[in-house]
Amino acid sequence: MLDSAIKDQLKGLFAQLEAHYTFDIFVHPQHESRAELVDSLEEVASCSDKLSCRLQDSEGLKFILLKEGKDTGITFRAVPGGHEFTSLLMAVLNADGKGKNFPDEFITRRIKALQGPISLTTYLSLTCTNCPDVVQALNMMVLLNGQIRHEAVDGSINEEEVERMKVQAVPTVFADGEQIHVGRSSMGDLLEKLEARYGSVELEAVETKEYDVLVAGAGPAGATAAIYSARKGLKVAIIAERIGGQVNETMGIENLISVPQTTGKQLAQDLKKHLAEYHIDILENRRIEKVEVAEGMKVLSVKGGETYKAPVSVSYTHLRAHETVLDL
């Protein structure tokens, strides 16, 4: 059950909804989780007149997110509690064009260029801290590319299927029955794997962008270099697969001076928030494929065809642990 404080927060979140959304529920009358699923979704739906539930008897347990009566392509075969409650909320908000987790224009173009149809399934646990990032990234791809569908499946209530698919860890992602990923991931990494599996429509060439400083890697050191450069009035871009870098893999951090205790995920969020305070282009979900020097400029090429150049590049990547490379 949701307490009054959470309900008030949900009412505030959903107050901005423009379209109407339906949780289209299909569940067996005798399913042990039927009451929990129906009660939880009805409770969420009660927080906005833009949300409703429709219940139908069926085999198993699932619900599909509908927008104005049409299938969005997002399905949950789970009771979205625990860490996946946020995934449910983000699915609704993102379907309405809301949220701060939308990828930038170039990543969006790459997602839209994926050749479908693509059917994705993510096996998860409601206690898994790595699962929501994967679920939310794939749901975002569904909303941006109508050729993609995604099911989020709770292994604890689909044990026979988990055993049949030989799932050993969560999250595990299957693409049309083929396992393509296991464990923590980012949107950029998942996108690369889908591009390799399905191919993409060729994108138009993108003009090389020029900066004063390019920072490769967005851990604490890379973020620091970008912020210090921006404070000097320089035009700066930071390029990384994900903000925070390896920090995201750390559960507890207690050796960051002036901060007695934090988590890797929280520190990564704080780094991104701090970077956003300055005129820094944050180029996330990108893997640098090539670095070269041309006419006195450092040129960085990333997966997907983008190129960037600057007279100065600073590298704080994890290819060689804790190594800093400064090119002047």
Q: Where are the model-predicted features located?
A:
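N-terminal Rossmann-like dinucleotide/flavin-binding domain of flavoprotein oxidoreductases
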Residues: 32, 37-40, 248-307
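Thiol-based oxidoreductase modules, predominantly thioredoxin-like and allied folds used
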Residues: 50-58, 147-159
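Structural micro-motif
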Residues: 57-74, 164-175
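Non-catalytic, surface beta->alpha helical segment in thiol-disulfide oxidoreductase systems
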Residues: 69-98, 176-199
